């Protein structure tokens, strides 16, 4: 494997040689410090102080050179601007062409500077990881916290790179102004939609986007999916391999599976209480009916995740068949007068949850250039299914019999979904294409592209990742000079092989993010699952009214994420949004309580909207942070970060639905406050936990 030390030497610009991070020296120092600590010559506090000072000096060297180069580029642009002003008064086509070439040369030099920043960023990240691995100490957390929060932070000055943005803006404007359009010179500020798309500007913007990991709506949506493996291939050969694996119709089938499953989950919510009553149970038993699907999903997520190591087609076939049978059982329970059959039907539906397969397919089989779009499609399909489920239930208000089979508002959701899954099964059988798989390595399947990516360190790898975070297997330092413990063993890079080993990889920051995810899913499930019971008790809403209310809640998901992903997340840090959205969620929960003798529709609807929207915002920010602070060993394999977050969310739904059923024994009048109390406590605990780990959330 190409080690980073050699890559740094090969890729650095010769005339800038003295300004790169001295990775070789830093690596030797880490080894030396390790030996000194083992021999008792230095204590750890002294080592931390010395190493911090050395790293500070290296970063300062990079910062000062970066600022110097930015100033030089700005000076060149200023001089070219004077020439442009002269040409504006006395146009000369040949002179304009020469001037545009001069601007392009500045652009090429800017790209060189971005590559300089990238190599150094990768070097800093790697040396921090090496130090952590050597000493078993989260030095990265300490260093990031102490340096990034300082008002004179050099880390912030480099990696926010405001100066680069100013240079890009100046280049874009000047190149656009040199483009003759109908005999005049137009400003990109006057007509941004018609601004010149010069290839050099596209190259610069691409580099800046990768380096900053800038947030936009598409990326914000994609982060909801917690789909890992977003590195770009470094060679045309790798891109060709990825393209060979990619099959558009197979991707669409995975997204449709996601959509149908979410419809299947929420289509029964408006009528579950009536169905329970018709079978002789209390209306609050709807909690068990709704939650039984989540109970089964806890187990199905694990075996589907493991199964996807070997195949995607067979798990999807199995999922469709089980979901078809589950919905038939759910619908037939009415005529069989059996609550047991009803719950078995929902359990079967939960056993057919293939969301782990859908995530894995996008991660492994979709080319990197469109993986974020596919991830956003996964989230959008989930949100659309969540809205369509209750809306569809509101439309299924007919009542008739065919022979001995009853079709009404309780059974029609089951029959409709059974037909939908049967049609999907036929489409899947005809159209799905199983991607080629390489030999199995260490219990996990590796495709040719991932094998090559593991062997080739690439420039884009650092650009695509934040500076100080754990990276994937290919980001590990497999230097040829191996000593006792400096170069991690193969085991230190293997994915987690069990829930227990995955849990041991969780840092306090990750645990807090999983707690927050549990909390928000719990609050949302309480709100949605008991909505039919609460609204019927207090407001006498019928099934159609409940369905419309739930559909409206579901339809807020994409607009809210559009606002947050496009605007708000670019103005504030993720951790700031995390704290604010939790506080807003807490406010929504508090206002949901029935404190006075009357409980109005306005209070319920407004508090529900605040709670639901806050939880949606929180989910996106939470998963974004979770992907940043999670160990690289949890980015692949069966027990990956996506599975852990799914398990946390599913467990929250199970607990919430059980809480509803248990609280029902105290009476419908007490149901609302009793079920909201755990939400209040867990939300307060998550806010306190966030406050304690706030400085490590990067």
UniProtKB/Swiss-Prot annotation:
Pfam families: MFS_1, SPX. The keyword Transmembrane helix applies. Residues 2-145 form the SPX domain. GO terms for cellular component: membrane. Residues 467-495 are annotated as: Disordered. It is a multi-pass membrane protein. GO terms for molecular function: transmembrane transporter activity. The keyword Chloroplast does not apply. Keywords: Membrane, Transmembrane, Transmembrane helix. Belongs to the major facilitator superfamily. This is SPX domain-containing membrane protein Os06g0129400. It comes from Oryza sativa subsp. japonica (Rice).
């Amino acid at each position: 494997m190409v080690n980073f030390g050699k890559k740094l030497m090969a890729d650095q610009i010769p005339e800038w040689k003295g300004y790169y991070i001295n990775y070789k020296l830093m690596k030797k120092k880490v080894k030396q410090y390790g030996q000194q600590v083992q021999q008792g010559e230095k204590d750890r506090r002294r080592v931390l102080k010395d190493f911090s000072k050395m790293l500070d000096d290296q970063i300062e060297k990079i910062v000062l050179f970066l600022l110097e180069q930015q100033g030089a580029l700005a000076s060149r642009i200023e001089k070219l601007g004077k020439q442009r002003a002269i040409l504006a008064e006395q146009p000369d086509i040949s002179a304009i062409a020469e001037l545009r070439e001069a601007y392009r040369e500045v652009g090429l030099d800017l790209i060189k500077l971005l590559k300089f920043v990238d190599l150094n960023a990768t070097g800093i990240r790697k040396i921090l990881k090496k130090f952590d691995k050597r000493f078993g100490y989260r030095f990265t957390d300490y260093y990031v916290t102490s340096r990034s929060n300082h008002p004179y932070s050099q880390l912030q000055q480099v990696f926010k790179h405001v100066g680069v943005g100013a240079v890009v803006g100046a280049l874009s404007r000047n190149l656009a102004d040199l483009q003759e359009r109908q005999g005049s010179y137009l400003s990109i500020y006057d007509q941004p939609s018609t601004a010149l798309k010069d290839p050099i500007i596209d190259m610069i913007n691409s580099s800046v986007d990768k380096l900053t990991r800038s947030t936009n709506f598409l990326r914000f949506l994609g982060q909801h999916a917690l789909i890992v493996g977003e590195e770009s291939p470094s060679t045309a050969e790798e891109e060709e391999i990825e393209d060979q694996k990619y099959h558009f119709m197979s991707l669409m089938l995975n997204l449709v599976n996601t959509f149908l499953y979410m419809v299947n989950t929420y289509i029964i919510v408006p009528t579950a209480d009536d169905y329970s009553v018709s079978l002789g149970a209390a209306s609050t038993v709807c909690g068990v009916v709704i939650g039984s699907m989540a109970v089964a999903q806890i187990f199905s997520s694990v075996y589907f995740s493991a199964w996807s190591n070997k195949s995607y087609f067979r798990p999807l076939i199995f999922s469709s068949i089980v979901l078809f049978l589950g919905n038939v059982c759910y619908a037939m329970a009415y005529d069989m007068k059996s609550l047991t059959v009803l719950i078995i039907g929902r359990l079967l539906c939960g056993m057919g949850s293939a969301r782990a397969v859908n995530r894995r397919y996008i991660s492994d089989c979709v080319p990197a250039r469109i993986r974020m779009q596919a991830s956003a499609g996964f989230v959008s399909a989930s949100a659309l299914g969540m809205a369509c489920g209750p809306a569809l239930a509101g439309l299924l208000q007919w009542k008739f019999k065919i022979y001995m089979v009853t079709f009404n508002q309780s059974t029609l959701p089951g029959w409709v979904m059974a037909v939908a899954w049967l049609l999907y099964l036929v489409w899947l059988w005809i159209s799905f294409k199983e991607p080629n798989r390489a030999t199995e390595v260490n219990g996990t399947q590796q495709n040719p592209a991932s094998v090559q990516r593991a062997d080739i360190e690439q420039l884009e790898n650092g650009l695509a990742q934040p500076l100080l975070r754990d990276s994937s297997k290919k980001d590990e330092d497999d230097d040829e000079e191996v000593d006792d413990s400096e170069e991690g063993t193969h085991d230190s890079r293997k994915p987690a092989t069990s829930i227990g080993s995955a849990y041991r990889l969780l840092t306090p920051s990750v645990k807090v993010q999983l707690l927050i995810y549990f909390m928000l899913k719990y609050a949302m499930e309480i709100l949605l699952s008991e909505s039919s019971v609460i609204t019927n008790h207090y407001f006498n809403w019928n099934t159609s009214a409940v369905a419309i209310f739930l559909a409206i809640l579901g339809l807020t998901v994409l607009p809210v994420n559009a606002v947050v992903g496009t605007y708000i997340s670019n103005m504030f840090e993720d951790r700031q949004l995390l704290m604010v959205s939790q506080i807003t969620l807490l406010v929504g929960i508090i206002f949901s309580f029935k404190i006075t003798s009357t409980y109005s529709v306005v209070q319920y609807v407004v508090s529900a909207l605040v709670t639901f929207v806050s939880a949606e915002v929180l989910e996106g920010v939470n998963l974004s942070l979770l992907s940043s602070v999670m160990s690289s060993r949890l980015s692949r394999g069966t027990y990956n970060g996506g599975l852990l977050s799914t398990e946390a969310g599913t467990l929250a739904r199970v607990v919430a639905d059980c809480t509803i059923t248990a609280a029902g024994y105290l009476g419908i009048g007490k149901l609302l406050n009793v079920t909201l109390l755990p939400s209040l406590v867990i939300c307060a605990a998550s806010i306190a936990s966030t406050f304690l780990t706030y400085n490590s959330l990067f």
